[in-house]
Amino acid sequence: MTNPGPRYPAAQPDPVFPQRASRPATDAPGASRAPAAPGPRAAGPPAPGREAPGGGPELTGRRRAGLLLTLILGGLTALPPLSLDMYLPALPEVSGALHVPAATAQLTLTACLLGLAVGQLVVGPMSDRFGRRRPLLTGMVCYIVAGIACAFAPSVETLTVFRLVQGLAGAAGVVIARAVVRDMYDGLAMARFFSTLMLISGVAPVLAPVLGGQVLRFTDWRGVFLILAAIGLLLVLVVLRKLPETLPADERHSGGLADALRTMRGLLADRVFAGYLIAGSFAFAALFSYVAASPFVVQEIYGASPQTFSLLFMVNSIGLVAFGQLNGKVLVGRVPLDRVLGFGLSMSGAAAVALLLMTSGVFGHVGLVPLAVGLCVLMSGMGLTMPNANSQALMRTPHAAGSASALLGTSQFLVGAVASPLVGVAGERTAVPMALVQLSALLLAALAFVGLCRPWRARD
């Protein structure tokens, strides 16, 4: 029998990971803290992200623990793309097996995305109050149960309901992973770690559709959900044994729902934070319009097999991961984050313009290869946009990392859930709606970035 991990006496909190040297004392309006425990806290070894004596961020900390935590957090942030992308090659099969049109089958994808959005809004404040581990483990157990229920769903209505539950539960992984990063890191160290996290979690969208396509060789779409439930079980066992508590009891918020809402209202009142939140959300909408439309565009319009679609999706995801690593390993610390973010938006926007021209027939009949190149450029730009939008927003919110992470994730997935059905409004035989949604979303992201963040001005 597998050992579920170390047991702790009832009177003691979960093990606490060493924190950054200090936190700003200012909280969001209305936020309250639990009273500090009496007596001095024992000094631990330097934590990742602490300022080195020379003034730069110290990224390594305890190397072995840092690598292990990176893998765990990467696995947690990979859960949403796994839940969404591994299912993509099966969408046409779901449509046929349950005797529903493509637009109805796409609603099962939208339901999961909506659950991921709303779930983060709930779990984020809970993690600020109860710590990171308990809400995470509760959500992961519910994710496993929902995955099994999806595998045995008798109708598209039942499948849609349990996909919603699966998204609600899976939200715990991504929102708490971001909050843990904010607990451990600050400044440029956080931006670099987010890019490293993108490398780990970026493997998920690369491998998920390929794995999903291979699963369909041996079983039907129901087998995909059983594998997702098994992945959830593996993550639960790893978290139980290896993920420490990163939010000490004396730094937790003591208020209830009203306090959480006041904290979020204070965050949204910050113009610059709101700008990064909106820019990142609409950039994500452009990305997810590709995720929602590409199975039908590639397989129905261009006649490709599920395996060919999976390979094309993998190539595009590699572009996302590669540019994310370029951001974290080369650009961060050398080029201002706002400049990189702006370039990423411009790069994706130019690709969206080209895609709209190709799909609308301006260049005549365009084959699959030019379309795939345009999508790859668009996805690569996201590798520069998404980590920097999240980093810049979280740098302004050291006092409420869970709530800020929840707002970021909820906004991104909610806007994505609204945008995804729009790609199918003109039916299954045209890719114009996909390109139009992508271009519109990126224009709105750029307007929010320029109008609210005002990157040319000095910040408070």
Where are these regions (language model features)?
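Helix-breaking motifs and short loop linkers at transmembrane-helix boundaries and internal kinks
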Residues: A97-H99, G131, F152-T158, A169, ...
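Paired small-residue
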Residues: C142-A149, E157-V165, V369-L375
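Juxtamembrane intracellular "pre-TM" segments in multi-pass secondary transporters
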Residues: G54-R62, P244-L277
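Cytoplasmic helix-loop-helix junction between adjacent transmembrane helices
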Residues: F162-S201
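Structural signature of the two symmetry-related core transmembrane helices
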Residues: R134-A149, R339-L355
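Conserved MFS/SLC helix-loop-helix module at the cytosolic interface between two early adjacent transmembrane helices
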Residues: V118-E157
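Helix-to-loop junctions at the C-terminal end of transmembrane segments
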Residues: Q120-G131, F323-D338
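Helix-loop-helix hairpin linking two adjacent transmembrane segments in secondary transporters
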Residues: P154, T158, G187, S195-R241
